[in-house]
Amino acid sequence: MLLIALNTDLRTTGKKFLPNDINGGKVEKVNGPCVLQIQKIRNISAPKDNEESQAAPRMLRLQLTDGHTSCTAIELNYLSKISLNTPPGTKIKLLGTIEVKNGYLLLDDTNTVVLGGEVEHLIEKWELQRSLSKHSRSNIGIEGGPPPFVPFGQRCASVASVDSKELDSRKTLQASSVTKPVGENDEFEKQRTAAIAEVAKSKETKTFGGGGNAGSNLNPGAGGSRNKEVFQKEKIIRAEGKSEGVYRELVDEKALRHITEMGFSKDAARQALMDHSNNVEAALNSLLTGNKSKPVQGPPARGKGKGRGRTRAEEDDELTSARPSAPSTLFDFLESKMGSFSIEDHKLQSQSQSQVHQKPLNLEQNGIKDYNHKDYNQPRQFTRNDTRAPRNEKPPRFQKEIQASRQYEGNGPPKSRGSEKQSSSVAEQWMEERNKCERGYPRNDRLKDFSHLPSSHQNEGSYKKSYTNPMQGRGMKGGNHTEVKEEFHHQNSNTEGSHQKRGKKDDQRYNSEFYTDRRARTGNTETFTNIPNEKCFSANNELSNFQTILIKDGANDLSNGEVDQKARRFGPIKPIGTNLNSSHEDKSKMFSYNNAKKRSGPIKQERPLEAVYSGFSWRPGDECLALYWEDNKYYRAEVEALHSSGTTAVVKFSDYGNYEEVLLENIRPIQAEAWEEEGDFGDFRRGGDGQPRRSTRPTQQFYQPPRARN
């Protein structure tokens, strides 16, 4: 029983005996008897790396525990039964009164009796630590190691300094040569030789940066048949080189795993990677199209289109391919969304020209399809019909028009236009006549080609509509306030028929000023006297009062069917007393333009014409509304300086602080910002572009600060 107790760890079965504050220095003595267990023994009079040194008298420090509280004891006098070889777990019995100094129990042979005992797990740990401490550190004393221990009172031994020249010449990365078996080296050399021979056999010269064919993917067919033959020969040579050799089966495992994760089989992915020299993109393209190139049989035909940004390897794969009837790859899809290539240009041009001669059948054809196929340019686009606006940069007003036209088809006209829903038969008749007469007038701002004028449209009253529609459908103001109101109620009268507007605002502040369309360039009515269809256009002698002028340079701005961007902006004309006539040549140009491409269908009223107040003289410091070129909207600005030519001025946009040079015709007084609301009057009227008015407010909104740009 006693033996079992001695061999048991006291921390598991011991009873608390030592006071809690024995380590605090306040306890002066401990009254025995008591049994404590040795946890650790250390000779504090010798260095730790040589505790058995006899240079100084031995003084042992013992870590003792009663199973709950640990304390430290000092060998005050020599203990005969305790040494450094006494294992932890040994039990000692303290007799009498044990003096305590600064938390240390003072032990000697008179108050200490060794009972013995062996705690197995404590002894194993202790023996392991002792065996490891015997290992000497071999790098002591050499370069880079710790300095050797020098006993106190002795001088440091001088170590011979290492020659710096020897250090410079020493190779720090000297590796011991490992002799490999002869057979392994021979096999490696054979593989290496085979790989070199395979590369040399292909004799393929690498040209970086695209070589002489850089940019051929951007110019379809630019290389010609000669380039195709050269590339086919290179492809055949490359394919033959792939078909033999030691490493022909090796593929990039990472690329293989990437393709298999997309759902392709491992064998198909491996074959595709082998066919395209581990080019992941080319391999994916071949797998997506389902046509794997056969290396030995030469380049097969592949049904892929040439998109933007194609690599040369992909170009080689499709040299002899024919373009599919529909987009079959990602590149075909991107090609339809990005850039304007010649193929798509011809396709869209042919579609737009075919629409010139076909008549609309219903509202969907009149509205939605025209939005998809007509050219709605932005303000800075001013080329002919061979150039299109960016596909992804439609102004917000066009998007609103599409939504509004769809709303009209699904829900009917807005409820606020009750006066225009009086008779469905009148509406149908008006729509039919509207489609006949107005298709000679495209809605977009860009001037197209003036050279196409079908004779059939001349017979259908295209001349008449091409003159009336700019006044009616483009949101221009014509006549004074009373005349316009009268015109709304009397649709078939001959007083102001060509100058009324759809969804028009009557600004009473400018009753004496008359507005014109950007494309109206005639000053008399001689051309229109023999027009048969009075429903499409009516004019009388009062038409001569509405002299239309080109604000900037008159007829000289039109040349070869093109007009400069600045010349396209017109504004209100001086009062009736101003007499400026344009030439008959301008009239013919206008009609040719208006009949070049016909469109019909619901169109929202466009931004009212930018006003040029001809009689207004600007001075530096004047506040105004200036047109900003990017979004084609008016913002509050201040005139900073006027150009000596009298055509432009430098303005500072008040809310943004940036300076821009603006044409004087694109500057108007600050009072022109106000718009007056008009009541619900008028019936169905020509110039509505196939749809009743949706709003009495102009498309050009009031000033709203745009979002901050990055």
Swiss-Prot record:
Biased composition (Basic and acidic residues): 370-400, 431-451, 480-490, 504-515, 682-692
GO cellular component: cytoplasm; nucleus
Keywords for the protein's UniProt record, in alphabetical order: Chromatin regulator, Cytoplasm, Nucleus
A GO term for molecular function: transcription coactivator activity
Region (Disordered): 206-227, 288-328, 369-515, 678-710
Known role: Scaffolding protein that specifically recognizes and binds dimethylarginine-containing proteins. Plays a role in the regulation of translation of target mRNAs by binding Arg/Gly-rich motifs (GAR) in dimethylarginine-containing proteins. In nucleus, acts as a coactivator: recognizes and binds asymmetric dimethylation on the core histone tails associated with transcriptional activation (H3R17me2a and H4R3me2a) and recruits proteins at these arginine-methylated loci. In cytoplasm, acts as an antiviral factor that participates in the assembly of stress granules together with G3BP1.
InterPro entries hit by this protein: RMI1_N_C_sf (IPR042470), RMI1_OB (IPR013894), Tudor (IPR002999), Tudor_TDRD3 (IPR047379), UBA (IPR015940), UBA-like_sf (IPR009060), UBA_TDRD3 (IPR041915)
Domain UBA stretches: 250-290
Organism: Xenopus tropicalis
Localization of this protein: Cytoplasm; Nucleus
Top-rank taxon, per record: Eukaryota
Matching SUPFAM superfamilies: Tudor/PWWP/MBT, UBA-like
Domain description: The Tudor domain specifically recognizes and binds asymmetric dimethylation of histone H3 'Arg-17' (H3R17me2a) and histones H4 'Arg-3', 2 tags for epigenetic transcriptional activation.
Domain (Tudor): residue spans on this chain: 617-677
Oligomer and partners: Component of mRNA stress granules.
Positions with biased composition (Polar residues): 453-471
Name this polypeptide is given: Tudor domain-containing protein 3
